[in-house]
Amino acid sequence: MSSPGRFGQMYAPLRVPNYRMFLAGQTVSTMGSLIQMTAQSWVVYELTHSSAALGTVAMLGSLPLLFLSPYAGTLADRIDRRKLLYGTQLILAGLAATLAILVQTGLIQLWHLYVLAVVTGIVTALDGPALQAFAADLTGPTLIRQAVSLNMMGFQVSRMVGPSVAGLLVGFYGSATAFWVNAASFLAVVLALLRVRFTNEGASGQRGARSGAGGGTTMDAVRHILGNANLVNFYIYPLLYMFGAASTMTLYPVYVGDVLHRDARALGTIVGAWGAGNLATSFLVLPLVQNVRRTGLLSAALLIWFGAMLALLWAISLPPVMASIEASGASLGLPDPVVLAACVATFLSGATGPIVLSMASGLQQMMAPPTMRARLAAIGTTITFGTQPFVNLAVGYTGEIFGAPTALLANGVFVTVLVLLLVTFRRSVRAEVIRPHTMVNPSQPGPAASAPDGGDRTPAPAHAPARAGGAPVSSAHA
């Protein structure tokens, strides 16, 4: 397929009005959440100047995902997802408003941030699987993978804009303003939910949830995953990426404050550059790799991320390098060359994320039976994000003891070694795995037709899952 054709295929879900409205609302809400995340990290830093405290807040916010996401996925497969999302979005808005009031009145203490992080994590654990499954309920089964990629684009737009806006809000108006903006942003999803009207094709997941068709257990979903080596890989890739990349975000306030000696606006700019790298890849590269056949690309993306993160470490943490950058930048008349160098490094490291996360998530969903989608989404959340509490805590304390640059370096080396071992010893990582997928009727489980390229047949499970919006089942094998 030509490049223009691939780009057109990529944006096909935008022709669905329901999905268009929901994507817009979700993007606004995500932007608000990232504004709050950046502002909250700065509040923690101002209160404590401690990497350990930053890691603890991040851990407490992520810990509920580990324990609750599997149950949340089962819940989202059994009840009306729209009603569940109404509740979670309004509660999250209330929590953001509470944080805004505490900061604005000067009453905020570290323990408040700990408690709010836990409660927000609990609600987010309930919200996530339903949000993912609901988005694909809107598109129908033929557009799942493209919808996942567009969701990723919306997230990257938010990631690029959100931290930068947070830096401006905190710098000019104070942290409380950022939290008020986040509280208001959840209303965008609520308004989108009010306007959504299902078509016959897009309502299958909702009908299954209301009728109890998604009545299997989490273990059914686990067995479905373990039965396909390629599907297992698509849970490993994002885990490795998030282990290496996302956990480093915990240390950025320390980098900016203690290493660069800059303020919240610089933090927003540097984190925003990470988002800009994500966004550039989402718009320019993702459409071209929709049909890539070898998952080694994902491992390569992780290795590229590691190289960029090393560049970030050397550019920011080594005094001789910083002095050289400042001298070179001054001779060229560049504004704040050290921050600019950090932005270049974070842009390059951020550029790998959409490839890893979008391809893995899209293929997880394509390999999911329709009535199990939310459970497979929840398992992905548990594996990828549920482990973050421990990683965040470990990275935070490593930064506290050895310094933030050393913590980032150790994390990058660890991830790279794991990726190399995976590529070396797991044959399915190097094999062709993305083949034309055949549609199966969820109500008529049976063997999928042979793929046009001669792909193997894969029997569809008798219990059809329900994740993000349709029911294509992959014929990929190890």
Model-derived regions, located:
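Membrane-helix interface/capping residues of multi-pass secondary transporters
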Residues: 19, 51, 81, 110, ...
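Juxtamembrane intracellular "pre-TM" segments in multi-pass secondary transporters
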Residues: 2-19, 199-236, 259, 441-450
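Transmembrane alpha-helix termini and helix-breaking/packing motifs in multi-pass membrane transporters
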Residues: 41-47, 100-105, 161-181, 258-259, ...
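Helix-loop junctions on the cytosolic side of multi-pass membrane transporters
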Residues: 106, 133, 137, 179-209, ...
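Helix-loop boundary and gating motifs at the non-cytosolic
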Residues: 3-64, 229-274
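Substrate-agnostic recognition of the 12-TM MFS/MFS-like secondary transporter fold
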Residues: 20-37, 61-74, 80-95, 112-171, ...
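C-terminal transmembrane bundle of multi-pass solute transporters/carriers
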Residues: 57, 67, 71, 84, ...
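Small-residue-rich packing faces within the transmembrane alpha-helices of Major Facilitator Superfamily
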Residues: 62, 93-100, 156, 183, ...
